[in-house]
A protein has these predicted regions:
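Structural recognition of the beta-strand scaffold that forms the well-ordered cores
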Residues: 11-14, 79-81, 89, 214
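C-terminus-biased signal that marks the final domain/tail of proteins
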Residues: 66, 74, 83, 107-262
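A contiguous strand-loop segment
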Residues: 1-31, 59-60, 64, 251-253
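Short helix/loop capping segments that flank catalytic or ligand/cofactor-binding pockets
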Residues: 22-23, 88-91, 98-102, 109-110, ...
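Short, surface-exposed beta-strand-loop junctions and turns on beta-sheet-rich folds
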Residues: 18-20, 95-97, 228-232
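Alpha/propeptide regions of enzymes that mature by internal proteolysis
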Residues: 30, 34-60, 168-194
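Aromatic- and glycine-enriched pocket-lining scaffold segments that form the walls
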Residues: 50, 54-91
Length: 262
């Protein structure tokens, strides 16, 4: 499990934190000892809010242990949000675990979250309105109109630039209701989605956005938008689902669906 929401409206997502994450090498007696890839399940299965999670973290020990699918201990950090709107980031680095209040509601990958917050200082000039005209020794220069306030917004696919873009988009997009919010979030994440072929790793493999997940903490609803089909799928955490004793799978399409008019 890499993201999800529980019946109390607590949501969490695990993101890659390569080069930064440093987990315990051994288990500790009297603590919940789990691997990095098990943390999200533990969070959603044990906590009801961000505050509640913070109170339980002293009893958690994240141990470097490989996931069978990959054969490695996955370097991860986590973003957690609850029904009150509180948002936190959990990172485990060389000097221990850090549970950090997230004032911007955004997280990407490495570097550490504190670095990303400091880097925002380089982009305080960004705004949704045009820059005013300037006078250079009597020569008046006008901006090229709407959109000029975002000049300098980084456009590459690094985690650093994606963080800046998402913070900017989140800050200035219109505030809307739940169903509209999902559509709004889809538009926001369009700006940071990585298409196949534009980001190649050192080993020659592609890094791309396999899917987007949207979580409604008020109603415990999960929305998924896969790469190969931009249809948004919706699953509500109903009483019926919670009472099942076996996992329930919901199939999604592997090719883009179209609404044909003729």
């Amino acid at each position: 499990l890499v993201d999800g929401v529980n019946e109390k409206g607590l949501s969490a997502a695990a993101l890659y934190f390569s080069g930064e994450a440093q987990f315990a090498k051994q288990a500790e007696a009297g603590k919940a000892n789990i691997a990095p890839h098990e943390v999200l399940n533990w969070i959603l299965g044990n906590a009801v809010s961000c505050e509640d999670l913070g109170n339980q973290l002293a009893n958690l020990n994240i141990v470097a242990a490989p996931v069978k699918l990959m054969g490695i201990s996955v370097p991860l950090h986590w973003i957690i949000t609850d029904r009150s709107g509180a948002c936190y980031v959990l990172e485990v680095v060389a000097d221990g675990a850090h549970y950090i209040k997230n004032p911007v509601g955004v997280m990407t990958n490495s570097p550490d979250f504190g670095w990303h917050l400091k880097n925002l200082s380089n982009y305080t000039q960004l705004k949704p309105t045009p820059h005013p005209a300037r006078d250079y020794d009597g020569f008046q220069v006008n901006s090229f109109g709407p959109g000029s306030g975002a000049l300098g917004l980084p456009g590459d696919y690094t985690s650093v630039s994606r963080f800046i873009r998402t913070v900017f988009m989140r800050e200035y997009t219109d505030q809307v209701s739940t169903d509209q919010t999902v559509t709004q979030m889809s538009h926001i994440l369009n700006s940071v989605e990585i298409p196949k072929g534009v980001k190649i790793k050192k080993d020659g493999t592609e890094d791309y956005t396999q899917y987007r997940g949207y979580m409604d903490t008020q109603n415990s609803i999960y929305y998924m938008q896969p790469y190969d089909d931009q249809t948004i799928y919706r699953v509500a955490l109903t009483e019926d689902l919670m009472n099942k004793d076996q996992p329930t799978e919901f199939p999604i399409q592997e090719k883009q669906q179209f609404k044909a008019f003729n």
